[in-house]
UniProtKB/Swiss-Prot annotation:
Residues 138-392 form the NR LBD domain. SUPFAM superfamilies: Glucocorticoid receptor-like (DNA-binding domain) (SSF57716), Nuclear receptor ligand-binding domain (SSF48508). The keyword Magnesium does not apply. The gene is E75. One of its GO terms (cellular component) is nucleus. Its main location: nucleus. This is Nuclear hormone receptor E75.
């Protein structure tokens, strides 16, 4: 028989186990009350996973009586070992409140979910706070851990920098800098040499220093117990500030230079030219001079760096109160160390903490300079595109504003259209029919008007002189395609609404008209509805079914009057020739299923 629920006693470590498993999550996931796995929902009165839900359901439905536990019924039910002891697992299910009478149908209310998440976040925050405060109980141990982390992760401590700086001062060759111009007139890049090579080497050597700052922050007492989002926020905001505090000993106010890691000095003027940030470098030199005037040792610098990293006023912190408590404890440790080493200067800690706003200002300047540098790189990468667009717009204005203006041969070669394309007369260019003018609104958006090009006539063409040139505008290839291509259906596309408004006829297409001089006959248009070539004037609303006799596009429409399944435009039914006007009113219905420029004329549904 199934054992009754009263025979199971509630273990005392139930709530402790729940608190322990909650710590492993970020406070936004509901956990199983039995094994600590991710809960799938509210089952049998408690939040449980699918495994524990199915286990409890099978146990109560089949009335299974499990073998008693051989370990004094004290098995720890976790996700990794929940299947080892079924007796203790069922006991745990009943202990946390699972019952067949507590089955609820429907979804869990949002208000209840919010309460559960709030409770879990509260438990998580309290657990983290207890863990952090446990590491910060002993000030002596905290101070020793911070100093050890600083000495292990910093390659330019005071003990290491002092002999290097003394050696650099005694060798004047290190401080010699070749002459250079502040504003050179030659825009070509100057090759790196001397001081500029030192700056580049110093920049490359900063990568290990940045990794050292990150490692130093991870080894701070209480930092690993903070939420991961807060750790990332503190590192992003404090890496440059800690690096600047550490590099303060590398700035030499006596020689007005900065010591590189290879033992050489870089003058401030060389830094101005190399990094192109005069104000930022001057501010960094001034800050380093003020910090060096305090004569701090490595222990005091280590504690000051820890205070800078764990700043509670960083934007985006989730648990700012906990960071505030850690910050206050570190400030107390700094006060104890400063008072021990500088008893004659009681205001040293206040002067040291007053440098934090200066660090924030330098950090902001550095971020702005870095953003500007990235934008400059992006602009330099896209400079050819911008130049081409500007030259293209100039050619467009010249072609539209003055069609008769002349271009040189080099300018014509730079044009997007080669001079070997077909040439149309200046009269057609001025009228705007051969160019992609305002009438063809769809082409105007795709490509601007083509400029005029200078074409030279060879001696074989009968030119009077080899230097003689004839100015003629380049013919737009789209006009040739619209009149000569058999793929054109004459149907209005989505970009030709302006054509419809400006057209004098409902059935005529101005974008498919052919110049009379170019064709050698009367002007003809293609019907937009049935793709027929008209011989009547463009104002006629009824299509003409007579086959054209003289037309350059005769080969394109040679199958218009035939019933054949060719890749050319198939003819519509004959009744459509009398329904052109009615089709115009319903064209919007079937134009939605027709691409703007169909490769083959598609017959609409009757």
């Amino acid at each position: 028989m199934f054992c009754d629920q009263d025979m199971y006693e509630i273990p005392a470590d139930c709530q402790v186990l729940v608190d322990k498993t909650v710590i492993e999550f970020d406070g936004t996931t509901v956990l199983c009350r039995v094994c600590g796995d991710k809960a799938s929902g509210f089952h049998y009165g408690v939040h449980s996973c699918e495994g524990c839900k199915g286990f409890f359901r099978r146990s109560i439905q089949q009335k299974i009586q499990y073998r008693p536990c051989t370990k004094n019924q004290q098995c720890s039910i976790l996700r990794i070992n929940r299947n080892r002891c079924q007796y203790c697992r069922l006991k745990k299910c009943i202990a946390v409140g699972m019952s067949r009478d507590a089955v609820r149908f429907g979804r869990v209310p949002k208000r209840e979910k919010a309460k559960i998440l709030a409770a879990m976040q509260s438990v998580n925050a309290k657990s983290q706070e207890r863990a952090v405060l446990a590491e910060l109980e002993d000030d002596t141990r905290v101070t020793a851990a911070i100093i050890r982390a600083h000495m292990d992760t910093c390659d330019f401590t005071r003990d290491k920098v002092a002999p290097m700086l003394q050696q650099a001062r005694t060798h004047p060759s290190y401080t010699q800098c070749p002459p250079y111009l502040a504003c050179p007139l030659n825009p070509r890049p100057v090759p790196l040499h001397g001081q500029q090579e030192l700056v580049q080497d110093f920049s490359e050597a900063l990568l290990p220093a940045i990794r050292g700052v990150v490692e130093f922050a991870k080894r701070l007492p209480g930092f690993q117990q903070l939420p991961q989002e807060d750790q990332v926020t503190l590192l992003k905001a404090g890496v440059f500030e800690v690096l600047l505090v550490r590099l303060a000993g590398m700035f030499d106010a006596r020689t007005n230079a900065m010591l590189c890691l290879n033992g050489q000095l870089v003058r401030r003027e060389a830094l101005h030219t190399s990094v192109n940030a005069r104000f930022l470098m001057d501010s960094m030199f001034d800050f380093a001079e003020r910090v060096n005037s305090l004569a701090l040792n490595d222990a005091e610098l280590a504690l000051f760096c820890a205070v800078v990293v764990l700043a509670p006023d960083r934007p985006g912190l989730r648990n700012a109160e906990l960071v505030e408590r850690v910050h206050r404890r570190l400030v107390n440790c700094l006060q104890a160390v400063v008072s021990k080493h500088h008893p004659e200067n009681p205001n040293l800690q206040r002067d040291l903490l007053s440098k934090i706003p200066d660090l924030r200002t330098l950090n902001t300047l550095h971020s702005e300079k870095l953003l500007k540098y990235k934008m400059t790189e992006h602009t330099a990468a896209g400079a050819p595109w911008d130049d081409s667009r500007s030259s293209w717009s100039m050619e467009q204005e010249s072609s539209v504003g003055s069609p008769s203006s002349s271009y040189t041969t080099d300018e014509a070669m730079r044009s997007p259209v080669s001079c070997s394309e077909s040439i149309c007369s200046g009269e057609s260019a001025s009228s705007g029919e051969s160019l992609c003018g305002s009438e063809v609104s769809g082409y105007t958006e795709l490509r601007p008007p083509f400029p005029l090009a200078r074409r030279r006539h060879d001696h074989s063409e009968g030119a009077s002189s080899g230097d003689e040139a004839t100015e003629s505008p380049l013919k737009c290839p789209f006009s040739k395609r619209k009149s000569d291509s058999p793929d054109d259906s004459g149907i209005e596309s989505g970009t030709d609404r302006s054509d419809k408004l400006s057209s004098p006829s409902v059935c005529s297409s101005p974008r498919s008209s052919i110049d009379e001089k170019e064709r050698g006959g009367p002007a003809r248009t293609i019907c937009r509805c049935c793709a027929r070539l008209q011989r009547r004037p463009s104002s006629t609303r009824i299509c003409s079914w007579r086959k054209p006799t003289t037309s350059p596009i005769k080969s394109s429409v040679r199958n218009v009057g035939k019933r054949s399944l060719t890749p050319h435009s198939p003819p519509p039914p004959r009744s459509w020739s009398r329904r052109c006007l009615s089709l115009h009113s319903t064209r919007a219905l079937w134009l939605r299923h027709t691409p703007p420029w169909p490769p083959v004329w598609r017959r609409p549904l009757a």
